[in-house]
A protein has these predicted regions:
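Structural boundary micro-motifs
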Residues: 1-69
Length: 69
């Protein structure tokens, strides 16, 4: 599995509602100090890959919100 997919899947698994900025900050704080596959994938992302993950995550959250309305 590609690093982007690992990180995006973890974001989708952990954070499905609430404030996106808070979710991203919490994710960063959590995976800065953990030593696991998600941590390694997260820190191997390039800047472009990080943006792609964020774009996909925001798109996912928008779709979930629209489905719940």
């Amino acid at each position: 599995m590609e690093n982007k997919e690992i990180v995006l899947d973890e974001l989708k698994y952990l954070y499905t509602e609430g404030y996106i900025f808070g979710d991203i900050a919490h994710f960063h704080d959590t995976y800065t100090y953990e030593d696991n596959g998600v941590n390694k994938a997260y820190f191997e992302l390039s800047e472009d890959e990080e943006l792609e993950v964020l774009e996909e995550y925001v798109k996912y959250r928008k779709q979930r919100r629209l489905l719940n309305e």
